[in-house]
Regions:
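Noncatalytic scaffold domains of N-terminal-nucleophile
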Residues: 23-48, 52, 60-197
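N-terminal secretory signal peptides that target proteins for export/translocation
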Residues: 1-3
């Protein structure tokens, strides 16, 4: 599909617009602004990733993908490739709205009977039986192919680089992760993956 004249997108947990009001300086959240638009995100690193994409010719969809992927690196407990993605995209040229539901599916074998055999009467809050098959990455691919100006690999490059090189962990995230240590210790696989040896 040829590049759309303008795309304005809203992706869960990522908001983009082309007009920035003055930031309320009584709050501590950062805002990163570029000539081609603004990107708002919980993490300044994520906002910067989106801005870089805008500055190098990407559109709002590309920036949203880059921002969401970076959030998955710097705040994996809140966002990213292990979760769902929902998007409403407005194509200004055609005046049409497009919706994408990239929520994951429960595994085929995840039945009520299976859970009952495990002694569970309700959905567990932790562990392998508490999750679905992630849909975010497939959603990123579909959005990039249909509405993006860049390839998905280009949109993901900032987050891949950050994951490989490391990043400063904000105080709030460090506190959140520290508070999760006891929960991680209850699961041998999680403990061996996420806790220091």
């Amino acid at each position: 599909m040829k590049a759309l004249a303008k795309i304005f997108g809203f992706v869960a947990l990522t908001m983009l617009s082309t007009f920035a009001n003055a930031q309320d300086r009584s709050q501590t959240r950062s805002m990163v602004i570029s000539r081609g638009g603004i990107v708002a995100a919980e993490s300044p690193l994520a906002a910067q990733a989106g801005v870089r994409i805008l500055e190098t010719g990407g559109n709002a969809i590309d920036a949203a993908i880059a921002t969401n992927a970076m959030m998955g690196v710097v705040e994996p407990m809140m966002n990213g490739m292990g979760g769902d993605l929902f998007a409403i995209v407005y194509d200004a040229k055609s005046g049409r709205l497009y919706g994408l539901n990239a929520s994951g599916w429960a595994p085929k074998g995840m039945t009520i009977e299976y859970l009952h055999k495990l002694g569970l009467l309700e959905m567990p809050q932790q562990g392998v039986n508490s999750i679905i098959v992630p849909g975010a990455v497939d959603g990123w691919q579909k959005l990039a192919e249909r509405f993006g100006r860049k390839k998905l690999a280009d949109d993901l490059a900032p987050s891949i680089r950050t994951a490989e090189e490391g990043f400063p962990v904000p105080e709030w995230d460090a506190a959140y992760w520290s508070a999760s240590v006891n929960d991680l210790r209850t699961n041998a696989a999680a403990a061996s993956t996420y806790l220091p040896k």
